[in-house]
């Protein structure tokens, strides 16, 4: 028996846009829903199932393209239910596509993929765009994912009637399984496509541009919708998840959005004060060091850290000075330091004198 044209079922033209198709479906679904029809429930259920199936095909870009090219065989792959209650979860489930929610996605949706991306701290801090290459299954261009040789027919599986699923009754429960005859495809291909050998999918290397937002850190992941494995005909592709790993930096340590670094300074600069250069992710900056600076003193440079991921502004750069003790002194330098040390009194080393005074009182 010939099947009705899906466009005729919904009462729309073949060039109707998505908005027109959805409007027609909503109107017809409301009119013919079995819960709203008082008489002849069986006919209402049949009509409603017909409307629902037509909308499932024409509202999906890939399914509609396959239907336009191959007719009912191309569009029907993995759509609908085989026997049992055609209304699944009831009124709310059926109208899920109109009012939100709805049934679980087809099992033939493409798998999600993961790509581990290592970037340096500067790219993580400031944002960047990087190119990656991933191996993935994509829809065969030769047969548009149908799996059949061009110009040949694809037969509907006689066991599952093209649905790809069969239902069996076990006591009070109905169990649904993939059809063993067609391996869940809903179709029988007599003359396979020479490119994909009837699979509808081909393995390719694809280059993608990934936008890295400023402020990402190790553990963050970026989702690229539809860039996972391609689904079988009529089913959506999976997603690609890019897992970010930030390399350890030679100078900076990161804590949230702040950067820390240790800056060595010489004894004279620490004692007398002066200017020193400190690194940032972009360039070098000069900061003033006051006289009498001690090891461990912190200098905070506002907004010179990592950009915030979800708001404006950046963290800070915190530089900790470390006074470097001179080494490899010659005799003259040693004598000069000795004279300098002898000339210093308690007021020049207040912390040392305070410490030794405490020691004396402690030991009596």
From Swiss-Prot:
Under the GO molecular function aspect, what terms does this record hold? ATP binding; heat shock protein binding; unfolded protein binding; zinc ion binding
Q: Which GO BP terms sit in this record? A: chaperone cofactor-dependent protein refolding; DNA replication; protein refolding; response to heat
Task: Return the GO cellular component terms, semicolon-separated.
Answer: cytoplasm
Location in the cell reads: Cytoplasm
Q: Which residues bind Zn(2+) 2?
A: 157, 160, 179, 182
Key words, A-Z: Chaperone, Cytoplasm, DNA replication, Metal-binding, Repeat, Stress response, Zinc, Zinc-finger
Q: Which PROSITE patterns match?
A: DNAJ_1 (PS00636), DNAJ_2 (PS50076), ZF_CR (PS51188)
The UniProt entry lists the main location of this chain as cytoplasm
The UniProt entry, under InterPro entries, shows: DnaJ, DnaJ_C, DnaJ_domain, DnaJ_domain_CS, HSP40/DnaJ_pept-bd, HSP_DnaJ_Cys-rich_dom, HSP_DnaJ_Cys-rich_dom_sf, J_dom_sf
What NCBIfam families is this protein classified in?
Answer: DnaJ_bact, PRK10767.1
Record-given protein name: Chaperone protein DnaJ
Q: What organism, scientifically named, is this protein from?
A: Ruthia magnifica subsp. Calyptogena magnifica
